[in-house]
């Protein structure tokens, strides 16, 4: 038996890059709520005292972009001007254009339509070329890798204890990283123990009557053990042990944070958004993009495929790649890999995927109702996945997390085996 370490990180909603992702998806939610046909590519930059919203938007919706920006910043928790960034005092600059008519043509009128080789679902072409990956494994109940699952739990808990006043001295910016020791036996990898927990969290310079930084850091570490780490691991089978390293603010001090400490940009946390580096990534970001962009919708669909394969007990680990050409509806390739954990061959699974999953953009939009979900969910949907992961979210009802095809896949394999 061999052992190895694997690490994944997460960031809080107050991290500068995540502020941008959430603003981008708040704009997307508002536009799709009014006009489900909106074409959106909203990019955001934040820095000390400043927000820039740019990109390409084509819509009939009428929204107050500046108000959307300020409301989201306030919800995240940046309300004090002395942080160098606050909802009411930051400047908001808008620089928005319409979607390129050449790109719009390829999306609205796919190659299959232009060559008269189509059915109704061929009408929408992919918004760009690219490759997307989906993944699932049996390490957690939500079928996600353990390191990223625990890292997200930690950052969500950091935000919770800040907002509910349990640890009122915490500020919005923060990060967590979890290192898991895996055991490999007979070619099978299983998480064995938690090797390292790293938390960096922004905090007030003075906590109660403590002003000495060493005392402040000791208080933070003790509080995080009690109010964050303990509750996060309470319902997990794998927990920190006597040898687990706990690192809290190892840089020594974290008072200056958020956009005052670092600029932020939409789309810079794509590994945090997905599988924490445990699976491959095609490179395309999600936030700020309407669902006709396959960077987003096809990555969700690939996760759906992989999760249903694992839920059907056809594999313990499954990765699905799908690739597209701009303006073409049908994927140019589909690939399935189970890393030696499959109950049937990867080739058989690829045939199963082609038979039971329609991965054309219009079919993905239809099956998940991606353009109408914001209106159906009271005006907010995408902004809720813009922090703490787009995948493996038991706290949210996400259509790509459903395992409604697992029974069908299992039956199809059993039927084929009986022939």
Curated annotation (Swiss-Prot):
GO terms for molecular function: ATP binding; magnesium ion binding; methionine adenosyltransferase activity. L-methionine binds at residues 56, 99, 262, 293. Binds 2 divalent ions per subunit. Binds 1 potassium ion per subunit. ATP binds at residues 15, 173-175, 253-254, 262, 268-269, 285, 289. The keyword Protein biosynthesis does not apply. Signal peptide: none annotated. The keyword Transferase applies. K(+) binds at residue 43. It is found in: Cytoplasm. InterPro entries: ADOMET_SYNTHASE_CS, S-AdoMet_synt_C, S-AdoMet_synt_central, S-AdoMet_synt_N, S-AdoMet_synthetase, S-AdoMet_synthetase_sfam. Pathway: Amino-acid biosynthesis; S-adenosyl-L-methionine biosynthesis; S-adenosyl-L-methionine from L-methionine: step 1/1. One of its GO terms (biological process) is one-carbon metabolic process. It holds the Pfam family S-AdoMet_synt_C. Its EC number is 2.5.1.6. Belongs to the AdoMet synthase family. Catalyzes the formation of S-adenosylmethionine (AdoMet) from methionine and ATP. The overall synthetic reaction is composed of two sequential steps, AdoMet formation and the subsequent tripolyphosphate hydrolysis which occurs prior to release of AdoMet from the enzyme. This is S-adenosylmethionine synthase.
């Amino acid at each position: 038996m061999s052992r190895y370490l694997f690490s994944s990180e997460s960031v809080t909603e107050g991290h500068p890059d995540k502020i941008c992702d959430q603003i981008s998806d708040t704009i997307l939610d508002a536009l799709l709520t009014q006009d489900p046909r909106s074409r959106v590519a909203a990019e955001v930059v934040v820095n000390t005292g400043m927000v820039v919203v740019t990109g390409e938007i084509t819509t009939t919706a009428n929204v107050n972009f500046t108000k959307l920006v300020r409301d989201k910043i306030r919800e995240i928790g940046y309300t004090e001007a002395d942080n160098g960034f606050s909802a009411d005092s930051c400047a908001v600059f808008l620089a928005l254009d319409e979607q390129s008519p050449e790109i719009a043509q390829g999306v609205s009128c796919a190659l299959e339509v232009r060559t008269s080789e189509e059915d109704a679902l061929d009408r929408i072409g992919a918004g760009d070329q690219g490759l997307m990956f989906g993944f699932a494994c049996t390490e957690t109940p939500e079928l996600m890798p353990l390191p990223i699952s625990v890292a997200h739990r930690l950052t969500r808990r950091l935000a919770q204890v800040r907002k509910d006043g349990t640890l009122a001295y915490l500020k919005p910016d923060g990060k967590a990283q979890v290192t898991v020791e895996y055991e490999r036996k007979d070619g099978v990898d299983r998480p064995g123990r938690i090797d390292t927990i790293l938390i960096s969290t922004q905090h007030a310079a003075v906590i109660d009557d403590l002003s000495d930084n060493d005392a402040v850091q000791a208080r933070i570490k003790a509080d995080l053990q009690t109010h964050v780490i303990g509750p996060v691991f309470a319902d997990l089978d794998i927990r920190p042990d006597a040898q687990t390293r706990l690192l809290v603010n190892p840089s020594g001090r974290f008072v200056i944070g958020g956009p005052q400490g670092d600029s932020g940009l939409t789309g810079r946390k794509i590994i945090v958004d997905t599988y924490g580096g445990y699976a491959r990534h095609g490179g395309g970001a999600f936030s700020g993009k309407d669902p006709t962009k396959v960077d987003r919708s096809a990555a969700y669909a690939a996760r759906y495929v992989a999760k249903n394969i694992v839920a059907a007990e056809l594999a313990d680990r499954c990765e699905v790649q799908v690739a597209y050409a701009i303006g073409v509806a049908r994927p140019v390739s589909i690939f399935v890999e189970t890393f030696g954990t499959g109950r049937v061959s990867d080739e058989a699974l690829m045939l199963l995927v082609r038979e039971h999953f329609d991965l054309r953009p219009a079919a993905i939009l239809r099956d998940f109702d991606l353009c109408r979900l914001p209106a159906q969910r009271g005006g907010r949907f995408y902004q809720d996945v813009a922090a703490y992961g787009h995948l493996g979210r038991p706290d949210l009802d996400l259509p790509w997390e459903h395992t409604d095809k697992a029974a069908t896949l299992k039956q199809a394999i059993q039927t084929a085996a009986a022939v």
